[in-house]
């Protein structure tokens, strides 16, 4: 992958200071160079920021006092704050996180062998997928780098402080929260770079996953920027159904989307040659055995594993959750074709933290112009 510098939209705070959470390592080194310091100082500060979740320059004991004073004058480390916490009976935690005067939601999902953090990339979403609660709230804006990586930072700080209670440290990050990550590449990519950086959170590229509904030009662009695990929100075995439930399919149909996925796989080491297919199970919409046969035929040339996701309801939604028996029959058809097929266990649905339930603030649904502009950015690659 090419080492392409991605410039954040805006890295200064209201008081004119640089928020260091907005900078990846290359940018951090440039920042310290401008201060007249050696590049290794950037590495030292990043280690304090991400290995120890430190946001106080005075606590960085291997930084000399003069430099600490200089940093306090021109920079800060400001992660978004948690304004509400909900805990599920299954151990899942959902945090409402303040980003300016709005909120996004971040979900911590502990399991026996890992702990996954589901991170948001936008306030709301422009894509209007019919089965997703986030999409029904409309689109407001992109999150900055500091607001994306800040979700990981804040969660890591909370979990780190709670080690005595047995909470597992974050081992995986999935860009599957609110928003379409590929419509915010300029901020999502630097945030993921920090997740992967040894002086950042040091995660393996196989443990950072980006999920997309199919913004094809941006997916091609992503392949030249960074290598992470890829999950695609397919949800339908044919264009007729997908046009209805995932409207971006009218711009980039399934064939076009899967071709872009295969191009990404050719460049990627993180995916080990196959992609994760996400398929939400909607009762008598896309969950029949005939749909399973169609899906198997559709994916025969795309190396993949398939996650079947029981749909999680929200008020006013026109769908129902597929029965366990229908999901089981669907899964067995796919496995008969040789596909690795997993029925995802629903986590956090009692606190509306499950897949498709994140909403954050309710946003004025009349903001159609903003949503159409964002959909236009999916077409104009210069705007993505």
Swiss-Prot record:
Active site: 105 (proton acceptor), 355 (s-methylcysteine intermediate)
Pfam families documented for this protein: Radical_SAM, RlmN_N
Group of enzyme by EC: transferase
Location in or out of the cell: Cytoplasm
Disulfide bonds: 118-355
Keywords per UniProt: 4Fe-4S, Antibiotic resistance, Cytoplasm, Disulfide bond, Iron, Iron-sulfur, Metal-binding, Methyltransferase, rRNA processing, S-adenosyl-L-methionine, Transferase, tRNA processing
Cofactor: [4Fe-4S] cluster
Chief location bin: cytoplasm
Annotated residues for binding of [4Fe-4S] cluster: 125, 129, 132
GO CC term, one of those recorded: cytosol
Residue ranges annotated for the Radical SAM core domain, each copy included: 111-350
GO molecular-function term, one example from the UniProt record: metal ion binding
UniProt xrefs under CDD domains: Radical_SAM
Signal peptide, first to last residue: none
Listed InterPro entries: Aldolase_TIM (IPR013785), Methyltransferase_A (IPR040072), RlmN_N (IPR048641), RNA_MTrfase_RlmN (IPR027492), rRNA_lsu_MTrfase_RlmN/Cfr (IPR004383), rSAM (IPR007197)
Function: Specifically methylates position 2 of adenine 2503 in 23S rRNA and position 2 of adenine 37 in tRNAs. m2A2503 modification seems to play a crucial role in the proofreading step occurring at the peptidyl transferase center and thus would serve to optimize ribosomal fidelity. Unmodified tRNA is not a suitable substrate for RlmN, which suggests that RlmN works in a late step during tRNA maturation.
Note: Reaction proceeds by a ping-pong mechanism involving intermediate methylation of a conserved cysteine residue. In details, the methyl group from one SAM molecule is initially transferred to Cys-355 in a typical SN2 displacement. Then a 5'-dA radical formed from a second molecule of SAM abstracts a hydrogen from the methyl group of mCys-355, and the resulting Cys-appended methyl radical attacks the substrate adenine ring.
Protein name: Dual-specificity RNA methyltransferase RlmN
Name of the gene encoding the protein in the UniProt record: rlmN
